[in-house]
């Protein structure tokens, strides 16, 4: 078999025409490695080698495009390639090559991920650490890089979230409001000792003004359907759910 023509395609590929009417789609890397010039003779053994190396290039460039679209951990990238049903040996080879070239690096990934989460979310350190662990980042790397999220920054973030919680839940009583904010911060991944040290700076006393306003609002809502002791019972239940208590003068 002899090469009679080339046609440049997209994404670094070429269509190679042979004199037996066969056409090959090969990466430029393959053409350069095997010095595939016009009129070059190809035997079946070489054809097998070309196909194997072309597959290798395909896995590598698919992996490279994947991390160019979004930086990934080694585990994430490997799972991505396995889902595409590439042979495991070629996947491992591509990943090793990317590691050697510096395109893959779990420490750099962890650092970038943590910075991004700090800037774009309200997540606490434990939640971020859990997400990195799910991406199979080494625990030593996680523990070292999470130091980027300083206690000072966490404290300021907790204060911001407490203020927001107070503002958006202004119709709740002090005890219920404090517990809700505490639970929200814990779920967000903040350290409970740090939460307690910050939250104790705030006053969460029951506010009689809030209770009165809520009572009047509930009265207007339910007095159209209930009256007397039944109406009072329903209003008291609703107030209790909000951590409020109000006795009419």
Briefly describe each language-model feature range:
Residues 1-249:
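An alpha-helical, amphipathic repeat domain used for nucleic-acid recognition
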